[in-house]
Amino acid sequence: MQKPVNNNFKESLLRTVESLRKSIRSGEMDDSTSGLVPGLVQANIVILPKIWAHDFLLFCQKNPIACPLIDVFDAGQFLLNSLGKDIDVRTDIPEYCVFVGGVKTEVKKDISDLWQDDFVVFALGCSFSFEYALQQAGLSIANLESNSNVSMYETNVPTKSVGVFQGNVVVSMRPFTPAQAIKAIQITSQFPLAHGAPIHIGKPEMIGINSLSNPSFGDSVEINEDHIPVFWGCGVTPQVVISNAKIPMFITHAPGKMLITDKLYSELR
């Protein structure tokens, strides 16, 4: 049975995230959001023209581990009221990646000047949302301990293609001892909207990762001898897949720099 929400606890989180979003909106904060406001849901963001939105929606539905869909918004809608008070997707993410013809052309802190009335926003679940549950269970998260971004890798695991959208899964990695890994599986399997259980454990070469010390995105972390790598689906997958499609323009969050919502992580169960 899910524990009742402590209203004072939630109110404290909401005050914290309101202040944090103000600093993000002003451009003062542009770091990774991993570990920030633990207890609240973080979301990967994809923004693309309406003409491509239906196929991308189907892609998310066919690939729920890599692209767990929290919400999709009407064309032109930039205030994401279902995710929180006064959330403006054009300004409230630390950094955005802008892609033109499948190529990342710039990184921005504010995309208000690029906004189009036909843009459709997708909010996808993020593994940062279950980090709090892991910590509550006594598990140490390597990248948080080293104050760095999570390690993310492109794999050889194919997604289920839809229309022009095709490519391989991107994963995030956190090292644990075997016993801790079992506990992490049990915990994260309760959060399907935050990528759920790991898709692979151990032997990175089996999923096409040649070097853990050279992540495709994010930062590398030290892996102790008694630890094994544990891999979860990752919301950077859409960046790779949509880039492969070479559509004229799309925008995403920068890897590791998410939209922090007003929703409690327990609401993702």
Swiss-Prot record:
Q: Which SUPFAM superfamilies match?
A: PSTPO5379-like
Q: Pfam families in the record, alphabetically?
A: D-Glu_cyclase (PF07286)
Gene Ontology molecular function: lyase activity
Checking InterPro entries in the record gives: D-Glu_cyclase, Putative_hydro-lyase, UPF0317
- Into which EC class is this enzyme placed? lyase
Keywords of the record: Lyase
State which residue ranges cross the membrane. none
Family designation: Belongs to the D-glutamate cyclase family.
Would you tell me the protein name for this molecule? Putative hydro-lyase Swoo_1731
